[in-house]
Swiss-Prot record:
Annotated signal sequence range: none
The EC number(s) this enzyme carries: 3.5.2.3
Family: Belongs to the metallo-dependent hydrolases superfamily. DHOase family. Class II DHOase subfamily.
InterPro entries: Amidohydro-rel, DHOdimr, Dihydroorotase_CS, Metal_Hydrolase
One Gene Ontology CC term in the entry: cytoplasm
CDD domains in UniProt: DHOase
Alphabetized UniProt keyword annotations: Hydrolase, Metal-binding, Pyrimidine biosynthesis, Zinc
Major enzyme class: hydrolase
An MF annotation (GO) of this entry: metal ion binding
Catalysed reactions, as listed in the record: (S)-dihydroorotate + H2O = N-carbamoyl-L-aspartate + H(+)
Binding residues annotated for Zn(2+) 2, in chain numbering: K98, H135, H175
Protein name as it appears in the record: Dihydroorotase
PANTHER family: DIHYDROOROTASE
Length: 394
């Protein structure tokens, strides 16, 4: 008989974007809704979080929106950061520093170009057991033969170099998408971990080319790369764990032509354009990001079951990440376990809970036309599809 119920220790998402303003109001409560009790929050806001004070203020806003969730803060690696600020951040519970190569993803214009410049920062981080979170891609450069399909592989020399210079520094290669990245992390010592997103366990290049809702950075790669991600989860490797990279974008930014170029049946909004510019969001092209927070743990269970790794669910969504970061003994971990129940069919007890909503809309914008770019709404991954597992709520 197949497993019908699973109880797992408190899930933790070690890479999530919770944005600002109305979008943050919409998506922050979704963290708990998706089954997660600890959220490691990215700092690429506008402006980016580069100081302890900014991080504390941001975490306070998030806690006001979702008091039941444990939020862990990070800083944005930039020239503004100093060793003294690192020490201050560590004393105030900020756990990591996120590195973005310049221009490779959302709000990365302040990203870095030369890692050696930051060696004093890394040295101080090593002293305080802080974590360096690496977005592992190089910027596209046609002259150098770099594009989105090999940007991650080309980055790996930087991972090896930083790890070699600072062997005691905890490093996480974020959202790995390639077999090369998986093997690179395995080759490194115990201080190097790796997050894998659920959507990269599902998608390949065919699934995002021409399909904006599945477009993210780094992009999903080839079937063999996806197989490597699945295999390392199935193996239960202790240094690979959940980081959803759940990244909400307004629908207008996933399908920008509908608002910015006057597509048939739409009406561009001047106020909408102003809103996009004011929030630092691109007004052309497709924003990179897949949104999974609201369905995260049931989605992970569904995917892992599909490729024969359901027995590794607890390691993937809770144990491995908490062990790497040192959150395995906190009260959230001890008392935040959740139970999942198998959804037998669409006619089961709670079919609505197993069907992913088509869209989430901020309550204040429910009467705003979809054609208005200022409308705060986000389409989740697998919208309209059925999940194989649901959270049992008391």
């Amino acid at each position: 008989m197949s497993v019908q119920e699973i109880t797992i220790p408190a899930p933790a998402d070690f890479h999530v974007h919770l944005r600002q303003g109305k979008m943050s109001e919409l998506v922050t409560p979704h963290v708990a809704e998706g089954g997660v009790s600890l959220a490691y929050v990215m700092p690429n806001l506008v402006p980016p979080i580069t100081s302890t004070q900014q991080a504390m203020e941001y975490l306070e806003r998030l806690r006001a929106l979702a008091p039941q969730t444990m939020f862990v803060g990070t800083l944005y690696l930039s020239p503004d950061l100093t060793p003294a600020e690192i020490a201050k951040a560590a004393q105030n519970g900020v756990r990591g520093v996120k590195s973005y190569p310049r221009g490779v993803t959302t709000n990365s214009d302040s990203g870095i170009e030369d890692y050696e410049t930051y060696y004093p920062i890394f040295e101080e981080m090593q002293k305080h057991d802080m974590v360096l979170n690496l977005h592992g891609e190089l910027p596209s450069n046609a002259d150098a033969g770099i594009c989105v399909l090999n940007a991650e592989e080309k980055f790996l020399t930087h991972l090896f170099k930083i790890h070699g210079e600072f062997p005691k520094l905890k490093i996480v290669l974020e959202h790995a998408t390639t077999r090369k990245a998986v093997e690179a992390v395995k080759q490194c010592g115990d201080t190097v971990g790796c997050t894998i997103t659920p959507h990269h366990l599902e998608l390949i290049v065919d699934d995002w080319a021409g399909k904006p809702l599945n477009f993210c950075k780094p992009v999903a790669k080839y079937p063999d790369d996806r197989q490597a991600l699945r295999d390392v989860i199935r193996q239960g490797h202790p240094r690979f764990f959940l980081g959803s990279d759940s990244a909400p974008h307004p629908l207008a930014n996933k399908y920008p032509s509908a608002v910015t170029h006057g597509a048939p049946g739409t009406k561009a909004s001047a106020s909408g354009s102003d809103h996009l510019e004011a929030t630092g969001v691109v007004s052309c092209g497709c924003a990179a990001g897949v949104y999974t927070s609201s369905i995260l743990v049931p989605l992970c269970a569904t995917l892992l079951e599909a490729f024969g790794a359901l027995d590794q669910l607890a390691n993937y969504v809770s144990i491995n990440g908490r062990n790497f970061y040192g959150y395995n003994d906190d009260q959230h971990a001890k008392h935040g376990s959740i139970k999942l129940r198998k959804v037998r069919s669409r006619s089961s007890i709670s079919p609505a809970a197993a069907t992913v909503p088509a869209v989430y809309v901020h309550p204040e914008f429910r009467e705003v036309p979809d054609s208005d770019a200022s409308k705060v709404q986000v389409v989740p991954f697998w919208a309209g599809k059925c999940l194989g597992w649901e959270i049992v709520r008391s």
